[in-house]
């Protein structure tokens, strides 16, 4: 039966990244397009043992309905974790367990946005965040990302010239897609600007632990004394994304609304993944696992950067990230949507920059590469194939 799509859904397009998974059915295809963590670091055997123990000894806790706020013991464990790792002082009634960091963004949009309200985002920005805001009829306004994070002067001018700004969305650590990390000075400035203008900040921090040198900058939330910052954390990049497990840290009055948002979305995050994460953190050192991730991703990033130096045309500029999963490239004069289509023919996948833009219809010269999932030799071969396509534009 034919049907008319709602206004909120009519603005959404399928993620090109998800569409590219279809091309991976070809065994000769090399994907530099994903955003997945390295599967070889999933603690499969440990989680299998924990799951068996839970289902044997606590089947009701795993399989019965739970509370919308999330498992109390897991929230208490996260409170310990963020105090130790991020210097955050959080109470139990300020944390909601969510079904991945994506849901933290979506619930925040649900709570705060009316159709036509404005959201300031980094340009470029995470497509999942952009689509969450689009689904609530938001006006998206981009502010450029510089080498040390969001352009503060441009942010000030954008706030002055844009009506009904409700939110600023930022990924300050190893940003998706740019790989850029925001400086401490800009974090402080961003917080003060938002506070002084009565605007909430969503601080999305899925990559913060994946710093190659082990040095972590203070979160914006750690600077927050007035409930301005809504902090999204995730287990997707430090344990396993299939658990669909994250957390939203917010003031108590906001958390109460987030719980209502959970109740109308999915009632609660599934209990078994919550218990798996809790017991993993109780029995094993998650920081040790994070250390292995840092070591592996640093090696893979270096392999990619070395290959880019060797095989890409000199006209291509790119970030050299200090952590995370991504390298952002700029190809002057090249429509990277067309480039990505040509790359498919050469058996390599990249993500064109328009996917990360507030206006996806405009020609974009940027593209994103991922180094976390492919074997080392395929990273090199993938960059080599990409270089052969790019050289056609510059020779």
PLM features: residue spans?
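Conserved glycine-rich beta-strand-loop-beta hairpin in the small C-terminal domain of fold type I
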Residues: 278, 295-305, 317-330, 344
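Conserved C-terminal alpha-helix-loop-beta "cap" of PLP-dependent enzymes
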Residues: 329-368, 381
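Conserved core of the PLP fold type I
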Residues: 61-198, 202, 208-226, 297, ...
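Conserved core segment of the aminotransferase class I/II
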Residues: 225-295
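N-terminal small-domain helix-loop-helix segment of the aminotransferase-like
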Residues: 10-100, 107, 282, 349, ...
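PLP-dependent enzyme catalytic core of the Aspartate aminotransferase-like
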Residues: 1, 345, 360-395
């Amino acid at each position: 039966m034919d049907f008319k799509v709602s206004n909120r859904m009519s603005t959404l397009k399928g993620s090109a990244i998800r569409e590219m998974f279809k091309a991976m059915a070809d065994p000769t295809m090399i994907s530099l397009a994903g955003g997945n963590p390295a599967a070889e670091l999933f603690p499969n055997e440990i989680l299998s043992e924990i799951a068996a123990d839970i289902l044997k000894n606590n089947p009701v806790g795993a399989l019965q309905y739970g509370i919308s706020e999330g498992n109390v013991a897991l929230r208490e464990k996260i409170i310990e974790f963020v105090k130790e790792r991020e210097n955050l002082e959080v109470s139990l009634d300020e944390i909601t367990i969510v079904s991945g960091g994506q849901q933290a963004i979506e619930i925040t949009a649900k709570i705060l946005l009316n159709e036509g309200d404005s959201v300031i985002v980094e340009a470029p920005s995470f497509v999942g965040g952009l689509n969450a805001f689009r689904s609530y009829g938001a006006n998206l306004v981009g502010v450029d990302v510089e080498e040390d994070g969001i352009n503060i002067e441009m942010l000030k001018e954008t706030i002055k010239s844009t009506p009904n700004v409700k939110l600023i969305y930022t990924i300050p650590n190893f940003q998706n897609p740019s790989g850029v990390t925001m400086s401490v000075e800009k974090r402080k400035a961003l917080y003060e600007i938002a506070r002084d203008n009565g605007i909430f900040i969503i601080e999305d921090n899925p990559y913060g632990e994946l710093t190659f040198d082990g040095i972590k900058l203070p979160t914006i939330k750690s600077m927050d004394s007035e409930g301005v910052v809504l902090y999204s954390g995730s287990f997707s990049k430090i344990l396993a994304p299939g658990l669909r497990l994250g957390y939203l840290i917010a003031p108590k009055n906001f958390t109460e609304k987030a719980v209502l948002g959970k109740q109308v979305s999915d009632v609660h995050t599934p209990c078994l993944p919550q218990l798996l994460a809790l017991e993993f953190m109780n029995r094993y050192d998650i920081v040790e696992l994070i250390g292995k991730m840092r070591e592996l991703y640093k090696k893979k990033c270096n392999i990619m950067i070395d290959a880019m130096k060797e095989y890409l045309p000199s006209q291509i500029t790119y970030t050299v990230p200090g952590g995370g999963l991504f390298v952002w490239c700029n190809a002057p004069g090249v429509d990277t949507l067309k480039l990505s289509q040509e790359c498919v023919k050469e058996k390599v996948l990249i993500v064109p920059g328009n996917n990360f833009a507030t206006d996806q219809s405009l020609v974009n010269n940027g593209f994103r590469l991922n180094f976390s999932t492919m074997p080392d030799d395929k990273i090199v071969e993938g960059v080599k194939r990409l270089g052969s396509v790019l050289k056609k534009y510059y020779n």
